[in-house]
Amino acid sequence: AIVTIPAGEKSVDFEIISNKKGVVADKVQLEIGVKYPLPEADMGRVEEVLRVVVKPYMEAEDLTEEQQALLEGYKAKGLDLSKWIGVIPVKVSVEVPPTDGLESLINGMKKVYTGKTVITLSEDATAEQPILKMTNNPMGLTEFMYDMLRKETVENDMFWYYDPGEGEINPYMAMMELIGLSKTSLETFEMTLDNIRVDFPNNGVSNVEFLGGRPDIWDETELVTVVPFAYNYSAWNRLKELLDAGDNELAQEYVDYGATLDPTQYLFYSGIDEDYWEDGNWMEPQGVLTGNKLTFQFNFDHYSAGGYSIIRVEYTLSE
């Protein structure tokens, strides 16, 4: 498809929309660039290519007979979770403080994300403890988390692309070359979140617990309390495969230096159950289910962070 920029203009608006035929079975990457010639004296040379990832429609997961029976039992006790099973709309607001360690976040970032999450009943749910699991776009944060991971790694121009000098090696660039990673390579990044514990309601309000422990990156015998997302990142999978094989000394050498792609090394760098940063941004982590709303609030930080980010999540069912 071709979009024409009218004479005398420097920009044009266009939309990429679904034809709703459901023919996309897997993620597809589209590239949007500029076709030359252009009046470079007026517009400069446009080198960037915009890459858009088109994803297939989300689908709800089928429940087993046992899970359906659990839902009926919860409903009898005053907690109707059946309406929260499926593809649920979500709105997320994120406030990231200024980050001196990353050029892309030098002024911080405020952004609102809208999307959908696939929610199902966890395999660990019991009659006494309702537990939900988010299997696709948990908390509506997949796009945000992948963006932050890329900012810390493959898009980190300040620290990952330095000139090592004659006869030396930049381990970050060497690691990327080893696994075929670049700013433009097509990668996949997915998240899930299990063990979302929902209390039976008290005066129509259910408390929702969603935090969990993760090994501290500096001392794996210690746990830090975070939102325990499980990550599946294609570039890290390739690097980890080399590390697990144990026969690639270069891969291990680069990672020992710090050139890793493990999402847990960059996302939720600190615990969020206490105010470790003391920067004025900490808030009590909270999850609440009431009526047609399921809301969460919690903090987040990353490897180069200058303080806590503030995240607020709201799921709202149609009336």
Q: Predicted segments — roles?
A:
Residues 1-99, 308-319:
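Acidic/polar, low-complexity intrinsically disordered N-terminal segments immediately downstream
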Residues 61-319:
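Ser/Thr/Gly/Pro-rich, low-complexity flexible regions
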